[in-house]
Each structure stands twice: as structure tokens, then as C-alpha cells.
Amino acid sequence: MSPPPPQRPSPSRAGRANLFSSPPPPLPNCYDPKHRRPAPPPLPSARRLPSNRRRRHDQPPNPTTGNGGNPAFRAPHLRTAYRKPVPPVAAAGEGEALLAADASDAADGRAVVVGPSGLSFRLPGAPFDFRFSYSECPRAPPVAIREPAFLPFAPPTMPRPWTGKAPLLTKEEKARRRGVRLHTPLGEEAPRTVSAHGIMMEVRGRRKLDLARVSPGDGRSREEVLGEPLTAAEVRDLVKPHISHNRQLNIGRDGLTHNMLEMIHCHWRRQEICKVRCRGVPTVDMKNLCYHLEEKSGGKVIHRVGGVVFLYRGRNYNPRTRPRYPLMLWKPATPVYPKLIQEAPEGLTKEEADEMRRRGKDLLPICKLAKNGIYIYLVRDVRDAFEGSDLVKIDCEGLNPSDYKKIGAKLRDLVPCVLLSFDNEQILMFRGKEWKSRYPKPLTLIPKIRKNNVPMSSDESSSDEATDDDDRLAVREVLRPKMFELWTNAIESSVALMLDDAEVDALTPDSLLTRVEDFSVTSQVVEHSFPAVLVANDESNPDVLNAEYTEDEPETGTLEPQQHEFTESSDVAEDDHFEDDMLKRLESSVPLGALPIDAVVKQLNDE
């Protein structure tokens, strides 16, 4: 039985019925602290609660997102903490390991190769294994990889399900599709009537670019493409126009990457020379960079100045039949490599390494590296510094941490040396216990006078002990023969000053400054002083000219040449004769008072 319908209240005598027994309460004042609601307690993190953790582990996997779904939906992203150890054979550097994310890729020969040279990608028909960077690959086998074994190239098929729509066309593509031209095919008669679809026409379109295609070229070798070697004149003519302009390929910290090979061929399509400008880490080993440029591109480095390389394409280069490689669509994740800094490096104990690190804190750096600079002489400077000290430090303030770590790894292999620390943006290196000097004799920074220039007394020459001491204290000359000769001439002409060890130890900074100031004044006087030459124009007074000879004249009246008098060379005599002839010509050709300066002097004298 349904309930009875609600009855309306009876109207009051005053008129309408009062629906509210009492007036509604006032709205709460949000500014009054009495009416404010208390803040809700913070929500606890779900991952920190042990109950939620147990519930998450006990929960069965979702069938829609499990292993049975499409691999595209369960692919790891940038925030995924992925780390997979490589096979032991590849980690030990004894061989290669092939990794493939899909069985079909492995059957087609598409795989990720992990070996002693790092991470590379193998495609069928490719002349070599592709890498992200060819010149900056570490010389140590990786320990683990940070992403699944996916190839960074366009796949031959699209296994991913379609989840979007076709991309929008650009203005150029729309204009290209609208650009049609009517024509009649060659060899056929023109249609008499027009069909329902119109007359025959051809639509202009861009050739589809196959990003996964590998074309090794026309099969010619690198020597056949290069042709005959260039002469010096041809190299000069090719390089000169490219020195000033900035149409170039810039190589940075990643070195020669895979996609730069396509850029080099794009430069070669319009010009014979590709100018490559290198900065940063790759300039530490320019020889390695030039090798990979020639090996991977097929060109020839014909000129190099500092960090600028000029790459020649070859006499028989054809851009239509050049090799074509697929482009990398993204940068692969860098594998995990062994640590560069170890607590106890090779050949040292932990206590010895800690002591060297403490000594390195007070050591002055040999140089300061600039950001994106050119470091072509860094290896040579480090080797020279190891001749005088067992520890060397390089200041890398302002550089990217990955940059100076790569520089340290290169120095470890090229110098070679032992890396101790990267603290405070500085590279600290030890030359190693098995280090051997490049010179047979010890190094000194003070040039020594040769033995044949030092006078030896009879007692010293006859003493065997003195001879033994000389052989034992024989010091190698740091300077080259030409530079040593210049130093010797400078000391003899009082332009340079050499201090002995005793004088150096006795000098204080103030006395050294005073000594340098006094010597600078003396050297300037010697340098700017010239012998005076007296020329007498009065031939009627021969006594003035012969006054200096009267005292030395013998009684016979003939002049005898002195024993220590130097004879004048033929070249000097010819020069004097030439100067006398020039003076006679000037005196005979220009009369007195004919020059403009003579008029000025006369006017000044009159005033």
C-alpha cells in the first residue's frame, strides 16, 4: 500500500503560510578563527606503508598490462631505473655479445652488440657496426646497459599499434600536392574525349626517404674514390676559399657522431672540401679524430690547423652513388663503465694513494683548461711535467664534470698515468711506479755551460776524483743548441744575466727586485749604445786625423799591423765602398740648399 500524499499546510489567517519554524542560521565567517575548519592530516605515502607494500606484492598482475600485452605499452621510459648486466664474455673484454629485444630482429641480423669497444649496433648490409660516437668511445668494456636492447633506427615495420592520427601537412607539402601539370605521355596519342576522371595528369611529389635503408655505395674502394694524390698547389687552391667562411661542421664533446656522416656528405654535395671545426674533449687526441673522419666518411684530411680540419671528398666522388646509412632517431643511453677513480689504484696501496691525494691538495696546477677550448698540447705538457714531479694537477674549473672525466680517461691512456682524484674540479694524476724518463740524463731548468767552454786547471784535469765527479754531475742541457747559443750571446753582450745557485739562495724578494731593476737599466744602456764614428771634412788639417797614430808610430815611420787586430772581411769592405759611392752620388746630384728642409732651416735662422 502506497503512503498517502503529503498535505499542504493550511493557510494562516494573516495570509501565506510560514514554511520555516525558525530563521536559517547565518553563514559562517571564514575570517573568524572559531569558524575555521581544522587542516586535514597529511596523507601517508603509499610506498612507505608496509601494509600497502605487502598488498602490492600479493596483488596478481593486471592481464591488460602484463607480459601478454604489446611491448610498446610496457617499454621503459626515462624515469625507469633500468640496469641489466652484460654477459660475462663481453664484460671481461674477451668477445662480443649480441642482444636483441625481438626475435624477428635477431633473425634478420639486427642486433645490439656489446663488446670490448663498447656499445654498437649491427644492421644487415652495413659495412661496419654503427655507434653513436665513433671517436669518443671509451677503451673499456661496459659493465651493464641502462636500457633494453632497442636499435635507435627506424624499424623496417611498425609493430606498434596505431594510437593516433596522420600528421598534419606543412605549407610546403600542401603547395607541392596542389602543383600539378597536365601532359600527354610520350609515345601515346592525345585522348580525343575527356573521361569522367578528367585527362591524364602527373602530380609532383617528393621521393620518400627510407630511414631504415642501408646502401654501401657503388662498390668502389676508398682509394678508387680518392684518385691520385693532390699536389701542394691543388691543396692550397682548395683550402684557401674555405679558411674565412663559416660553412663548417662543428664537433663538440660527443666527437664524431653517427648522424654527422650524413652532414659531411651534404657538404660534399656542393663543394669538394668539408671544413670541420673541433672544440673541447676531442681535441686532446686529434690523431684519433682524423683517423675516424677518414675511415668512416671515406675522405682524406688534406690540411689541419689546430682544431680545424679540412676533409677532401676525392677526385672521383659521385654524390648519387655515395654510401647511405640510416639516421639515429634518438641518443642511446650510455652504458655503465668501470669507475675511473679507485681507492687503491694499480700499483699503489690505499695508504699510498691517500698520501698522494693529501700532497695533491697543496700542488699547483700546471695549466687551467678553458671551456670548449683546444687541448692539442695537453698530453705533451703532462709528459713534460712528469719529468720534474711525480704528481701533476690540472685545473678544470668551469668545465662540465663529464668533460674533465673524459679528458682524464684520455690522458690515462695517452700519457700514460694513474688517475687519483677529480675533486674540486681538478684532475690529479700520478706518473706510476714503472715510469721511465724520456731522457738518459736528469733534467734541470738551469742551462749549463759546455765543458769545452769552462777553463780547467792542471790540478783538476790530473785528478781522477774530479773527473769522476764531473761525469757524475753531468747535466743534460734543456735548451736546444740554437737557443743555447742565443742565451750565451745574450749573457756575453750583457743583455741577460745568469745567477749562480749561491746567489739565488742568498737573494731575498726585495734584493732580487733591486737587482733586476739595476740590471734592466744597465742592459738598456748597453743595448742602445753604439760606437761613435768621427768624420773630418777639413782635409787641410791632416794632423787631426793622424793624431792617434803619432804615439804608436815606430821610428821607421811605417805602420805595422798589431797581432790582435782583426782583419776586415771582404763583405764589410764592399758595403763601405757601396756607401761611399752612394754618398758621392747624393752630393753630386743634389746641390746645397735645394732640399725643402734647407728652406725651412734658413727661414728659422732668419727669424
UniProtKB/Swiss-Prot annotation:
Stretches the record annotates as CRS2 binding: 482-505
Organism expressing this protein natively: Oryza sativa subsp. japonica (Rice)
Extent of the signal sequence: none
Record keywords: Chloroplast, mRNA processing, mRNA splicing, Plastid, Repeat, Ribonucleoprotein, RNA-binding, Transit peptide
Residue ranges, annotated region (Disordered): 1-75, 550-576
Entry function: Required for the splicing of group IIB introns in chloroplasts. Forms splicing particles with CRS2. Interacts with RNA and confers intron specificity of the splicing particles.
Entry's localization field: Plastid, Chloroplast stroma
GO biological process: Group II intron splicing; mRNA processing
InterPro entries: CAF1P_plant (IPR044599), RNA-binding_CRM (IPR001890), YhbY-like_sf (IPR035920)
Domain CRM residues, every copy: 228-324, 346-442
SUPFAM superfamilies for this protein: YhbY-like
Highest classification ranks of the organism: Eukaryota, Viridiplantae, Streptophyta, Embryophyta, Tracheophyta
Name of this chain's protein: CRS2-associated factor 2, chloroplastic
One annotated GO molecular function: RNA binding
Transit peptide: 1-79
Protein origin, superkingdom: Eukaryota
